[in-house]
């Protein structure tokens, strides 16, 4: 199956704020953050496992990873066993096929997150020529990033390695340190805003239109996106090159549930500030 995203959010308050659907990630080294009944999820997995992945799903990495994360049979076929596991660049072990545990990534939480240096990099999501992608699982509590390395071999995406690195060595380290506090501290959110923040939200009177304006920091509780992920985050590196930039685009994308949130942060005088957002 191929997932599709719909650029829309529902409204929850009368002053055109974003929706208030709350979904928090769990901070654990478990293979997934299970936010649904596991029995029902296992039954769904069995059904999906019997559904072959369309060949076209290897064209776009997003289409592949959704299938890979939901289809156990496919996942086992698309891993290069024994799978090497590295820590700080050194090989620590190799996982044999019989020892592998199903990795659902972000599928059961209903959304995933992306980090870009600029909006132009977002186009890489639809690039069918890329052959190397890294899915990052970011654990704030233990200050570690788990990287799943995928390479396209003979036209098929394969998981070729897993790497563990400390957050401080990540190319987004400065932003991640800031975002970890921003995501869980409402007062810090207000204090981490530009004097005016540009926003775009759905028009409550027209399902096909949006409203764009500016808000003051003290208005944030009424206008903020309904979901600001915390706990364990994900990031997909499609080939975007990160730098010590003064701008980060943080995106939240729903999995077949219509959710899409975009927040733009800029670093001014060493301090990250939210400058615009849309949902």
Give residue spans per PLM region.
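C-terminal motif of bacterial Sec signal peptides marking the signal peptidase cleavage site
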Residues: 13-17
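Short, aromatic-enriched amphipathic alpha-helices that serve as compact interaction elements
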Residues: 56-73, 172-188
